Curated annotation (Swiss-Prot):
One of its GO terms (cellular component) is nucleus. This is Cyclin-dependent kinase 2 homolog. Its cofactor is Mg(2+). It is found in: Cytoplasm. It catalyses: L-seryl-[protein] + ATP = O-phospho-L-seryl-[protein] + ADP + H(+); L-threonyl-[protein] + ATP = O-phospho-L-threonyl-[protein] + ADP + H(+); [DNA-directed RNA polymerase] + ATP = phospho-[DNA-directed RNA polymerase] + ADP + H(+). Disulfide bonds: none annotated. Phosphorylation at Thr-14 or Tyr-15 inactivates the enzyme, while phosphorylation at Thr-158 activates it. May form a complex composed of at least the catalytic subunit CRK2 and a cyclin.
Amino acid sequence: MEKYHGLEKIGEGTYGVVYKAQNSDGESFALKKIRLEKEDEGIPSTAIREISILKELRHSNIVKLYDVIHAKKRLILVFEHLDQDLKKLIDVCDGGLESVTAKSFLLQLLNGIAYCHEHRVLHRDLKPQNLLINREGELKIADFGLARAFGIPARRYTHEVVTLWYRAPDILMGSKKYSTPIDIWSVGCIFAEMVNGRPLFPGVSDTDQLMRIFKILGTPNSQNWPDVFKLPKYDPNFPVYEPLPWETFIKGLDDTGIDLLSKMLKLDPNQRITAKQAIEHPYFKETS
């Protein structure tokens, strides 16, 4: 820690406190102090393993992890620092981002996700707050792999409930099979939010979250999701909703954009488009 000075608290994240600090050359970094739930046991070996993988990730759309400081009962992760996140940007852009901006950010997000999925790393907690943006319009994914290293928490350490808005229906219904489609669902939710200027599924509980999804995309059945009945929290008595036309809840997106979004937000995880396939979608071939 002696390398860094001028610590300034800039946030309270899902896994601990985030500080901005400088090194002796005056460069800025983001320091994440990870709180450990079972402090007497020290740092879980899974966390150490995952973080060593994160250090190997090198991509222009992923926040770089420079250093890991292993103190007694805590871990300090030293990341590159960016001033802005996508949530703040959406909040100040009333009615959604300009289409060319949304398209640029979506493509950068998919490029970063595709790279990680190729390296068998899942994010598992994608949301606009975890997407950082610099003044050049570059988007970088933060907190990659931390959800896997420390477990997806039901609550933040500050007792604030972690947002469910970007969580896939398969996870909400108790699926333990974490694979790449859970990140793609989150990307779809973020895409819709960039376009609409507000969250697509702002649920307040697991059940409310599912109902909001079903009311828009329709209730899953054996035709559109053959394995849905196997999920632990699937209820055969779920209310039956028909899917709404996309243009009724997505504004300002052309047909190719809606086609891409619909492929990301498939109820059945096995039917969701991959990040690599999404990058090749005609939506990115058009000029906005």
